[in-house]
From Swiss-Prot:
InterPro entries: ATP_synth_F1_ATPase_gsu, ATP_synth_F1_gsu. The keyword Cell membrane applies. GO terms for cellular component: plasma membrane; proton-transporting ATP synthase complex. PANTHER family: ATP SYNTHASE GAMMA CHAIN, ATP SYNTHASE SUBUNIT GAMMA, MITOCHONDRIAL. This is ATP synthase gamma chain. The lineage of its organism: Bacteria, Pseudomonadati, Verrucomicrobiota, Methylacidiphilae, Methylacidiphilales. Pfam families: ATP-synt (PF00231). Belongs to the ATPase gamma chain family. It comes from Methylacidiphilum infernorum (isolate V4) (Methylokorus infernorum (strain V4)). One of its GO terms (biological process) is proton motive force-driven plasma membrane ATP synthesis. Keywords: ATP synthesis, Cell membrane, CF(1), Hydrogen ion transport, Ion transport, Membrane, Transport.
């Protein structure tokens, strides 16, 4: 059995750890509330925007836009959104597992977040070339303008036919306890995808009534289709941030509770060891007195 000194040292160490995890839990909870609010508030706009674009397509005549044009996929670029920091449970592991399931030699990658960048930078193509094309900085307060920079980078690759498809991989926020790894294609834009609604995750958007468009539907689509890609990227980043802070808050809460449970066990062990030590001393004194007559 460990000595009382060793047990006291372990108790001090665990108390210090519990204080740290509790502080991290509180910080993560504060960030989680802000990130969740941003992610959830963006969903009705995303749903409504899908309806607007869908209502434009029938009025656009025979418009042929590269972002609507399906073509044989020789190269695909995947934008992967992870985290800069760890201590968020299996969030990054689950996402990377999802990427591994879809990985192909014709894939190229763009990353956001150090954890996924470190993994993707080690991937090599069939000729030994690096598959990671670029890395973008992850920020808690990332703006739509910054998300557009990423969208422009990806769309330029697509329009110049350096790639034939764009996909995104991120952790979709469901609730503080559930974050779902998502891998989906966002270009070429599927007309079927445009009318899907995120009913389970967001409040229903108001129905879009028929419009007379000015300028023409064709001109509007020319501008709105790239904007659609930008918004997909922005919403995915917001979801991933909400998932990250939720997962970290839950992980730190669990660590704090485990530390408290361990402290209780150690306190019992300490009291037992101390009681045995006192009993032993009493026996030694009694034995000495008996020997002295």
């Amino acid at each position: 059995m460990a000595t009382t000194r060793e047990i006291r040292r372990r108790i001090r160490s665990i108390k210090n750890t519990a204080q740290i995890t509790k502080a991290m839990q509180m910080v993560a909870a504060s960030k989680m509330r802000k990130a969740q609010q941003r992610a959830i508030e963006g969903r009705p706009y995303h749903s409504l925007f899908q309806e607007i674009v869908h209502s434009l397509i029938p009025q656009a005549g025979q418009l042929i836009h590269p972002l609507l044009e399906a073509r044989a996929i020789q190269k695909e670029i995947v934008f992967v959104i992870g985290t800069d920091k760890g201590l968020c449970g299996p969030l990054n592991t689950n996402l990377l597992r999802e990427i591994y399931k879809h990985h192909s030699p014709n894939h190229l990658y763009v990353s956001m977040g150090k954890k996924v960048r470190n993994y993707l930078s080690g991937l090599k193509g069939s000729r030994g070339e690096n598959l990671l094309l670029a890395d973008f900085e992850l920020k808690d307060n990332l703006t739509f303008r910054e998300a557009k920079r990423i969208g422009h980078f990806l769309i330029e690759k697509y329009l110049h036919k350096e790639i034939d498809a764009i996909s995104i991989a991120y952790s979709h926020f469901v609730n503080p306890l559930i974050q779902k790894p998502i891998y989906r294609r966002i270009a070429p834009i599927s007309k079927v995808e445009l009318v899907k609604k995120e009913k389970a995750e967001s409040p229903p958007a108001e129905s879009v009534l028929p419009f007379n468009f000015e300028p023409s539907a064709e001109e509007l689509l020319e501008s709105l289709l790239p904007f659609y890609i930008h918004w997909e990227i922005y919403q995915a980043i917001l979801d991933n941030l909400a998932s990250e802070h939720s997962a970290r808050m839950v992980a730190m809460k669990s660590a704090t509770e485990n530390a408290k449970s361990l402290l209780q066990d150690l306190s019992l062990e300490y009291n037992k060891a101390r009681q045995e030590s006192i009993t032993k001393e009493i026996l030694e004194i009694s034995t000495a007195q008996y020997a002295m007559g």
